Amino acid sequence: MNNVSMRELLEAGAHFGHRTRFWNPKMSEYIFGSRNKIHIINLEKTLPMLSDVTNYVSRLAANKAKILFVGTKRAAQDSIREHARRCGMPYVDHRWLGGMLTNYKTVRQSIFRLKELKEMKEKGLFNDMIKKEALMLTRELEKLERSLGGIENMGGLPDALFVVDVGFEHIAVEEARRLRIPVIGVVDTNNSPDNIDYVIPGNDDSMRAVDIYVRCVADAILDGKNSNTVGRVSSDSEFVEVTSNSNEEEKSGE
């Protein structure tokens, strides 16, 4: 399930934590040591924990669960957007709006507005408006697309959150915990792993390292979805139809 090697993590700098003076003591069990006042993360712990995460999300995906990808810092935005789209999961890559989970009913109204504006634009209705009105609606559409475009088709609260940098995204984590939504999080040496259900100890500032974590999660989700499809096809193909004119069993594949 986990297709990443120790060498790949090392080359991406996944083992580099933060400066020792900024460390969180609760991360001590994941720290190998320090070099030049920088904490070194023990990748021998990261690798199996990343494997646990991929196994978990694969099981979720096989059961058609929704996993919300969250990464709004510069090092995570591109990877979050690219891989979430690739595996068909909702994502937040711009700015976490307070209440995005805990006040989802209100957020859903904004999503309806986003869909309404997109439909109006696709039908060319903006072209029939006066320039000022069309410009205002275009700006509103762009703002909503930037903030909510990634969760436009989420269709309700997610079944789990996958977060890059649990400190930076602490509001998202707090909202998920309040709603008892499981949290998967990349945790660097300056943050606490408390209240994170599935911890990935690792550098959350390296774009290459972040891309590895997110890619692995997305790959596992796709594997889970595929296993669900294969299982369904296999189950269908095992259906036996018995006819009154024959004693033979025929397998009917749909």
UniProtKB/Swiss-Prot annotation:
Alphabetical keyword list: Ribonucleoprotein, Ribosomal protein
GO-annotated cellular components: cytosolic small ribosomal subunit
Record bears the keyword Glycoprotein: no
One biological process term in Gene Ontology: translation
GO MF annotation list: structural constituent of ribosome
Top-level division of the source organism's lineage: Bacteria
Pfam families assigned to the protein according to its UniProt record, in alphabetical order: Ribosomal_S2
Keyword Metal-binding annotated: no
Protein family: Belongs to the universal ribosomal protein uS2 family.
Record's protein name: Small ribosomal subunit protein uS2
Organism name: Legionella pneumophila (strain Lens)
